[in-house]
A protein has these predicted regions:
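Flexible, glycine-rich phosphate/dinucleotide-binding loops
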Residues: 52, 104, 134, 175, ...
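Extracytoplasmic
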Residues: 38-40, 90-93, 122, 163
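Structured segments of extracytoplasmic/periplasmic soluble domains
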Residues: 46, 109-112, 116-119, 182, ...
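N-terminal targeting signals for export/organelle localization
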Residues: 1-70, 196
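Proline-centered helix-kink/hinge sites
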Residues: 41, 105, 111-112, 145, ...
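Short active-site neighborhood of thiol/selenol oxidoreductases, capturing the structured segment around
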Residues: 57-108, 113
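Structural microenvironment flanking redox-active thiols in thiol-disulfide oxidoreductases
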Residues: 91-141, 150-156
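Thiol/disulfide oxidoreductase modules built on the thioredoxin-like
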Residues: 138-143, 148-196
Length: 196
């Protein structure tokens, strides 16, 4: 005897999974990331090379004791195993590439970022592997620093739903804008010149 409740639950779960995955990998520009002039959201997250084991969520707290966001402000969480937006901003202009590591077009964007990074030593480049573990982030095979946003908190703060999303930040942490979808090397160069 089949149980309609079980079948309905399985169907609803499959539908929810499809909608979630489609949102992450969609080419549609429902969200465009941060816009020029938006405040730079602080974050601190483990690098893919960190020794953190188990669930290592990013810190997006702006003050002490903010529960799941973090027990201390994200800007104060620093170290050789941490990717920190405040630290990046203090060191000059930078580019953040948000990628969903299983999606090939996201992975493909990293090669162009590496090429452009070589030509612009005064601009820092970093990758955020969205909803990834350290192991998943390490599969990206890039020379750029890769942080992993295990629970998607940073992607949420940066309004990321499409992969790849690139956020360009000028000196002093001024957001210059974001792009959604893959960019050519020439398009990357144009954006990087705006912030350098």
């Amino acid at each position: 005897m089949k149980r309609p409740g079980v079948l309905l639950a399985v169907f609803a779960g499959a539908l929810l999974l499809f909608i979630s995955f489609n949102t992450i990998v969609s080419d549609k520009q429902g969200s465009k990331g941060l816009s020029a002039g938006d405040p730079l959201p602080p974050f601190a997250m483990p690098l893919s090379t960190s020794s953190c084991r188990g669930r290592c969520d990013a810190n997006v707290a702006t003050a002490p004791d903010q529960g799941a966001a973090g027990t201390k402000p994200a800007c104060s969480v620093r170290g050789p195993e941490v990717l920190n937006s405040c630290e990046l901003a203090e060191k000059g202009p930078f580019v953040l590439a948000f990628v969903f590591h299983p999606v090939q077009r996201c992975r493909d964007q990293l090669a162009g970022l590496q090429r452009v990074a070589i030509r612009h030593p005064g601009v820092r480049f970093a990758v955020v592997a969205v909803r990834a573990s350290a192991e998943g982030a390490r599969t990206l095979k890039t020379s750029l620093p890769v942080g992993y946003d295990h629970d998607g908190a940073v992607a949420n703060e940066y309004a990321v739903v499409v992969c790849p999303t690139l956020t360009f930040v000028a000196a002093g942490g001024k957001v210059a804008g974001s792009t959604v979808g893959s960019l050519s090397d020439a398009e990357l160069e144009t954006w990087v010149k705006r912030i350098s």
